[in-house]
Amino acid sequence: MSTQVCVTRLKKELLALSKNEDIKDIFIAKPSISNILEWHYVIYGPPDTPYHGGYYHGQIIFPVEYPYKPPSILMTTPSGRFVCNSRICTSMSDFHPDTWSPFWSNCTIILGLISFMTEDENGFGSIVKSKETRKQLASQSMAFNLKNPVFVKLFPELISDYKKKGTFYSSSSTPSSTPPPSSTPSSSSSSSNISKRNVPIPTTKTTPQDTNKKKEQKNNNIPYIILFIALIIILLYLFLK
């Protein structure tokens, strides 16, 4: 039986996800109708990867001790990157309770999984098929998901959009760039391809105060220059005399 702390936390995360516009073209996630500890996600294959156009359904199974203990992460849809329905080893899964942080959430976990997915790092539950195979599986992913009654029951809106638009994405035909791992600590964990968003480069600006300081420094040097010139003139006079 789930604890009140766990249930309250997961309800807050569900509300936060529903209001998060930044992830609407990256993934969708919601709990099972009958069990709030069993969440289902769908990752939209990131652009510029072999997964682009894919539609990857999986589960996050939370322990009753959540958020103090990490969940199990699985992927059901064949991707060429993970073993289907097998627990995936990441720094934010139950394989590594020592690296888990209670501050991480569903959103953090899924973004971290996407980051790990776009790399070729090995681990328990991971495989690395050829790019051609992964592209082929991406094109077949919707057909596979439509045979899954759990997917069909939980994500009717995605199926409806797919049939109407002929696209895998719920809000637009062109998904936004995937967002950075800062979220993942391999993390947050991984530093990877998730975050290919434009990051402003810090620039150094000259303020009026800086300009005034430079002028003052320049003015302070003038007497020394005049004195130096005067000494040269005196020395020349004595030498020529």
UniProtKB/Swiss-Prot annotation:
Localization, UniProt: Endoplasmic reticulum membrane
Catalysed reactions, as listed in the record: S-ubiquitinyl-[E1 ubiquitin-activating enzyme]-L-cysteine + [E2 ubiquitin-conjugating enzyme]-L-cysteine = [E1 ubiquitin-activating enzyme]-L-cysteine + S-ubiquitinyl-[E2 ubiquitin-conjugating enzyme]-L-cysteine
Keyword entries, A-Z: ATP-binding, Endoplasmic reticulum, Membrane, Nucleotide-binding, Transferase, Transmembrane, Transmembrane helix, Ubl conjugation pathway
MF (Gene Ontology): ATP binding; ubiquitin conjugating enzyme activity
Designated gene of the protein: ube2j2
Record Pfam families: UQ_con
Active site feature: C89 (glycyl thioester intermediate)
Protein name: Ubiquitin-conjugating enzyme E2 J2
Segments of this protein annotated with the region Disordered: 170-215
Compositional bias per record (Polar residues), positions renumbered to this chain: 193-210
Organism: Dictyostelium discoideum
